[in-house]
Curated annotation (Swiss-Prot):
It is a multi-pass membrane protein. It comes from Rattus norvegicus (Rat). The keyword Nucleus does not apply. Its main location: membrane. It is found in: Cell membrane. The gene is Aqp1. A motif (NPA 1) lies at residues 76-78. Forms a water channel that facilitates the transport of water across cell membranes, playing a crucial role in water homeostasis in various tissues. Could also be permeable to small solutes including hydrogen peroxide, glycerol and gases such as amonnia (NH3), nitric oxide (NO) and carbon dioxide (CO2). Recruited to the ankyrin-1 complex, a multiprotein complex of the erythrocyte membrane, it could be part of a CO2 metabolon, linking facilitated diffusion of CO2 across the membrane, anion exchange of Cl(-)/HCO3(-) and interconversion of dissolved CO2 and carbonic acid in the cytosol. This is Aquaporin-1. CDD domains: MIP (cd00333). Residues 30-46, 110-133, 182-186, 200-206 are extracellular. Aquaporins contain two tandem repeats each containing three membrane-spanning domains and a pore-forming loop with the signature motif Asn-Pro-Ala (NPA).
């Protein structure tokens, strides 16, 4: 960990996560607010689920392509946790990424709050349970939505695969959009604890907020269990791979590395 923290490239990656997360939350939540200027007194807030889902998915795909070669473009604590459990990043990197992601989400939500201050009852896209949905059901939706996302990340960035064509960022972006199409009517679709955290902090409303951390983290852990130990087990011993948690990857910034266990890279094969 000590050697990793001294590298400029490490801190560039952390800054990249912060900046990309700020842009992601601003663009995606901005689209979810669902109102047009100038505001009219009798205007109703109509949320187009397809528009919002595409905004979330396309923003992830664009930003993953933009900063993937710098940080891996996690942009989601659940994805970061998944890659940590998959022994692809160190504990230090995971902690710093999650902090950067949460701070980025707060900054973006603060900017949105200022821009949309004239909007009455502005929730800033805060996640909560829909009417008639209990906490257990909401938790289940968040688990499933995040599971399919992290499973997609692990599969599309697996260096052992030689059958991949096209764009990994686009595939992951579509997975994010798919998760929103599933979950948006039940929980507002979290599947990203940092995104949920930013809105909750600015609105000072943490009602049912635990669901949007616990659900995605459970879904992420399940995705790693399914992919790394059932669908595509790795040949290297798990105890050896765990060394990455403290030492990091030696070649983690080598974009042309051939190591099948090296860092996730949001880059077309």
């Amino acid at each position: 960990m000590a050697s990793e923290i001294k590298k400029k490239l490490f801190w560039r990656a952390v800054v990249a996560e912060f900046l990309a997360m700020t842009l992601f939350v601003f663009i995606s939540i901005g689209s979810a607010l669902g109102f047009n200027y100038p505001l009219e007194r009798n205007q109703t807030l109509v949320q187009d689920n397809v528009k919002v889902s595409l905004a979330f998915g396309l923003s992830i795909a664009t930003l993953a392509q933009s900063v993937g070669h710098i940080s891996g473009a996690h942009l989601n604590p659940a994805v970061t946790l998944g890659l940590l459990l998959s022994c692809q990043i160190s504990i230090l990197r995971a902690v710093m990424y999650i902090i950067a992601q949460c701070v980025g989400a707060i900054v973006a939500s603060a900017i949105l709050s200022g821009i949309t201050s004239s909007l009455l009852e502005n929730s800033l896209g805060r996640n909560d349970l829909a009417r008639g949905v209990n906490s257990g059901q909401g938790l289940g939706i968040e688990i499933i939505g995040t599971l399919q996302l992290v499973l997609c990340v692990l599969a599309t960035t697996d260096r052992r695969r030689r059958d991949l064509g096209g764009s990994a960022p686009l595939a992951i972006g579509l997975s994010v959009a798919l998760g929103h199409l599933l979950a948006i009517d039940y929980t507002g679709c979290g599947i990203n604890p940092a995104r949920s955290f930013g809105s909750a902090v600015l609105t000072r409303n943490f009602s049912n907020h635990w669901i949007f951390w616990v659900g995605p983290f459970i879904g992420s852990a399940l995705a790693v269990l399914i992919y790394d130990f059932i669908l595509a087990p790795r040949s290297s011993d798990f105890t050896d791979r765990m060394k990455v948690w403290t030492s990091g990857q030696v070649e983690e910034y080598d974009l042309d590395a051939d190591d099948i266990n090296s860092r996730v890279e949001m880059k077309p094969k």
